[in-house]
């Protein structure tokens, strides 16, 4: 089909490691035709199974309510609450990976050392983001098929593109 769509990635699940996040970036890189990518931090809402897992493993106090000095807009999108032992993600990892995930997902792995450096180097981050935005963003929303044919999603050969059809 030629319907525009976006991919959504959540970072910071209980027991998640940096390598798991990079596996998600690899999966997004292999995806074809998306015209948007949304990355968010995991939020542990009351009554959810993932909050229960975080509490049972003592990553999150049972009475936790989302709040903190760093939150903006109610803290729902930029405040990560759990504390896990290494090798699992740490708060600083989550913030850096949310910031740079689109770069990991867009660029080939041969450039991931640069992306890793950009997690803490703002000048390099801006340079890579400028390149990403120039190549990926378009003035209009495109459908998946158009985006693939114009090669403005992660780099793919048109011959490897799946043909989609709507069955009624």
Sequence positions of predicted segments:
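Proline-rich intrinsically disordered, low-complexity coils
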Residues: 4, 14, 61, 85-87
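Conserved C-terminal portion of the radical SAM core fold
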Residues: 1-50, 100-115
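Short secondary-structure boundary/capping segments
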Residues: 24, 52-59
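Compositionally biased, intrinsically disordered/low-complexity regions enriched for serine, proline
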Residues: 11, 58, 82-84
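Radical SAM enzyme core and accessory elements
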Residues: 49-54, 63-168
């Amino acid at each position: 089909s030629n319907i525009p769509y976006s991919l959504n990635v959540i970072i910071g699940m209980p027991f998640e490691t940096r390598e798991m996040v990079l596996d998600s970036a690899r999966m997004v890189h292999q995806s074809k035709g998306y015209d948007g990518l949304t990355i968010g931090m995991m939020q542990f809402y009351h009554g959810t199974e993932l909050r229960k897992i975080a509490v049972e493993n003592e990553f999150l106090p049972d009475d936790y309510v989302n709040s903190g000095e760093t939150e903006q807009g109610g803290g729902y999108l930029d405040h990560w609450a759990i504390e896990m032992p290494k090798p699992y993600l740490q708060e600083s990892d989550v913030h850096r990976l949310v910031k740079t995930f689109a770069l990991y997902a867009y660029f080939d792995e041969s450039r991931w050392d640069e992306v890793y450096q950009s997690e803490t180097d703002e000048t390099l981050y801006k340079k890579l983001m400028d390149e990403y935005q120039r190549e990926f963003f378009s003035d209009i929303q495109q459908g998946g098929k158009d985006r693939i044919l114009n090669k403005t999603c992660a780099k793919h050969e048109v011959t490897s593109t799946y043909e989609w059809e709507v069955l009624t």
